[in-house]
């Protein structure tokens, strides 16, 4: 049974994983807590605490073995298998998601793409042929897709979420600004670039205020 993690720790571990995987792609064999902290904006002390919490330790003066760290975090997060994804929405955003080369490297495969626009159905986005939304339930069952991504106009989001729930999808990533209503047992993660931008601008404003403050 996988260890139950607090949401905050899970979020930080995914950041460490992403950074370490990128460093491996750049040819690195080891990574320090300071580097992980610098790239994620997390205090290095917190980094060490988090990794100690999952039973992973580094070597003084060397840091953490990158490959071992990736395997440890992937194991804790349950990412050692491949997950098929059903993506609804073949517009600009959906096409960009389907064409991503990063997702497969992280164990996520856009297996099916759906839309209700006749002009989009049948064309290829990424490596996937767009299907009609009416095929969602059947395709999800055949491909064992447990993750759904909503990249539609906001007006269609709730209806799509309902279809995903009916298809037994249990994790939904919502790229719209609609607050979705789903039954217990279904998890919705809202991807909100605006919130991230406001979060970033807050720290930018704080830094500018500190720079403008007179010295004492």
UniProtKB/Swiss-Prot annotation:
Its main location: cytoplasm. SMART domains: CoA_binding. Keywords: Cytoplasm, DNA-binding, NAD, Repressor, Transcription, Transcription regulation. NAD(+) binds at residues 89-94. Residues 15-54 bind DNA. It is found in: Cytoplasm. GO terms for molecular function: DNA binding; DNA-binding transcription factor activity. It comes from the Bacteria. SUPFAM superfamilies: NAD(P)-binding Rossmann-fold domains, Winged helix' DNA-binding domain. GO terms for biological process: negative regulation of DNA-templated transcription; response to redox state. Homodimer. Modulates transcription in response to changes in cellular NADH/NAD(+) redox state. This is Redox-sensing transcriptional repressor Rex. InterPro entries: CoA-bd, NAD(P)-bd_dom_sf, Rex_DNA-bd_C_dom, Tscrpt_rep_Rex, WH-like_DNA-bd_sf, WH_DNA-bd_sf. NCBIfam families: PRK05472.2-3 (NF003994), PRK05472.2-4 (NF003995), PRK05472.2-5 (NF003996). GO terms for cellular component: cytoplasm. The keyword Transcription applies. Pfam families: CoA_binding, Put_DNA-bind_N.
């Amino acid at each position: 049974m996988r260890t139950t993690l607090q949401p905050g720790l899970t979020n930080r571990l995914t950041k460490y994983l992403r950074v370490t995987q990128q460093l491996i792609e750049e040819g690195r064999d080891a990574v320090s807590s300071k580097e992980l902290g610098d790239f994620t904006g997390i205090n290095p002390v917190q980094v060490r605490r988090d990794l100690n919490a999952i039973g992973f330790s580094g070597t003084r003066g060397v840091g953490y073995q990158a490959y071992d760290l990736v395997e440890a975090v992937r194991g804790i997060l349950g990412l050692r298998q491949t997950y098929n994804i059903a993506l609804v929405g073949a517009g600009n955003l959906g096409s960009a998601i389907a064409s991503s080369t990063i997702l497969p490297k992280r164990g996520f495969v856009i297996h099916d793409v759906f839309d209700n626009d006749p002009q989009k159905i049948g064309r290829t986005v990424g490596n996937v042929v767009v299907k009609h939304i009416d095929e969602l339930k059947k395709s999800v069952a055949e491909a064992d897709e447990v993750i759904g991504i909503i990249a539609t106009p906001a007006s269609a989001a709730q209806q799509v979420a309902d279809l995903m729930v009916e298809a037994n999808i249990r994790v939904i990533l919502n790229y719209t600004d609609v607050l979705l209503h789903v039954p217990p047992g279904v998890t919705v993660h809202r991807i909100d670039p605006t919130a991230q931008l406001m979060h970033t601008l807050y720290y930018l404003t704080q830094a500018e205020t500190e720079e403008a403050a007179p010295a004492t």
